[in-house]
From Swiss-Prot:
Protein name in the entry: Undecaprenyl-diphosphatase
TM regions (residue ranges): 6-26, 45-65, 94-114, 117-137, 155-174, 191-211, 223-243, 253-273
Record's bilayer topology term: Multi-pass membrane protein
KW Magnesium (keyword) present: no
EC number: 3.6.1.27
């Protein structure tokens, strides 16, 4: 049976996961850092992180459920999803599948290598490099995006965003950061790039989390269920709030503050763990 200390750890990590999963600051990096501070490491901690990520994924499903079902041809009320963009295009399942291919291929080929990178030093470097990518996206993006809305995104842009997503295989880089920045660099409006990133996260994270969970099921016990339930529920609620807030925020501010934050966190990692 989980004690109060375990439930407290679950709550704290649930908050961290929910807050950072869809912000361009790296949830994995923060989970590793906070986990080290709380003394919650090892195989059980990794399994716990996988499960609470599913809570964050559920938040995206709740936020974008009409769009997600629309991708597979299911339209509730007989009406298609409201068109977002200036062209006559539509976001289709093919866009998502194309964006998934690069990271899926590399992830399967180098799964064990990627898992070996989960250490504070590697996270520190990823935070810095990812910060520079955010700055590059703001400074080098086209003055007038070719894709103003989600439905304007082309197959080529979707695939290129998928290539940028491969950077997120480096722990600490940030999946949302790499895909949103990549989207901006290939001509997608910041807001539309964020929406595409969140929708792309659903199949990507379910696949990655499902594989990790399958490989670590033997670390679970019935006594861990309360702890995992608290972490899952907390991550879901916090992620829901974080996504809504983030989508509102990026209409008004650039990613420069997020880049600066990443540099600060990298400095903290250096001082504490190096």
């Amino acid at each position: 049976m989980a004690d109060m200390h375990s439930l407290f750890i679950a709550f704290v990590l649930g908050v961290v996961e929910g807050l950072t999963e869809f912000l361009p600051v790296s949830s994995t990096g923060h989970m590793i850092i906070v986990g080290e501070w709380l003394g919650f490491t090892g195989d059980k901690a990794k399994t716990f992180e996988v499960i609470i990520q599913l809570g964050s994924i559920l938040a995206v499903v709740v936020m974008f459920w009409r769009r997600l079902f629309g991708l597979i041809g299911i339209h509730f009320g007989g009406k298609p999803v409201e068109h977002e963009g200036k062209t006559t295009g539509h976001l289709k399942l093919g866009h998502i599948l194309l964006a998934m291919i690069p990271a899926v291929v590399l992830g399967l080929l180098f799964h064990d290598v990627i898992k070996s990178l989960f250490a504070p030093k590697n996270v520190m470097y990823a935070l810095v490099v990812g910060g520079f990518l955010l700055l590059a996206a703001e400074w080098l993006k086209p003055k007038k995006p070719s894709a103003e809305g989600l439905d304007d995104i082309t197959y080529r842009q979707a695939f290129m965003i998928g290539c940028f997503q491969c950077l997120a295989l480096w722990p600490g880089f940030s999946r949302s950061g790499s895909t949103i920045a990549g989207g901006m660099l290939v001509g997608v409006n910041r807001y539309a790039a964020a929406e595409f990133s969140f929708i792309l996260a659903v199949p990507m994270m379910i696949g990655a989390s499902g594989l990790d969970l399958y490989k670590s099921l033997h670390f679970l016990t019935m006594g861990d269920l309360p702890m995992f339930a608290v972490g899952f529920a907390t991550a879901f609620v916090v992620a829901l709030i974080a996504i809504k807030t983030f989508l509102t925020l990026i209409k008004r501010i650039s990613f420069v503050p997020f880049a600066i934050y990443r540099f600060i966190v990298a400095g903290v990692v250096y001082m504490v763990f190096m």
